[in-house]
Amino acid sequence: MKTAIFTVVLALAVFAVLSFGWEANEKALSEEFTELIHEKEAASETEARECRYFWGECHDHMPCCDWLVCRYKWPITYNICVWSRTFPEK
């Protein structure tokens, strides 16, 4: 009887250690994935856009992209980039 209880307790201890190892590995993988996402995001931000996106706020110092035009749209109190009915050339 003592041997069976000892075996069960030992098995539970082994499962606890393995579970802790898997959680640590999963957490490290999650952190690595998050770091990769932030790295990709930072890389895309470094590619400076010289124009504003669709429905983005525009001014003289913030022009719209080639296929967009800056228009005043009521009731919005600022100018936004809207489609100029043209397509960008590649």
From Swiss-Prot:
It is found in: Secreted. Its main location: secreted. GO terms for cellular component: extracellular region. Residues 20-50 form a propeptide. It holds the Pfam family Toxin_12. Residues 1-19 form the signal peptide. Keywords: Disulfide bond, Ion channel impairing toxin, Knottin, Secreted, Signal, Toxin. SUPFAM superfamilies: omega toxin-like. Disulfide bonds join C51-C65, C58-C70, C64-C81. It comes from the Eukaryota. Expressed by the venom gland. GO terms for molecular function: ion channel inhibitor activity; toxin activity. Belongs to the neurotoxin 10 (Hwtx-1) family. 13 (Hntx-13) subfamily. The presence of a 'disulfide through disulfide knot' structurally defines this protein as a knottin. Ion channel inhibitor. This is U7-theraphotoxin-Hhn1c.
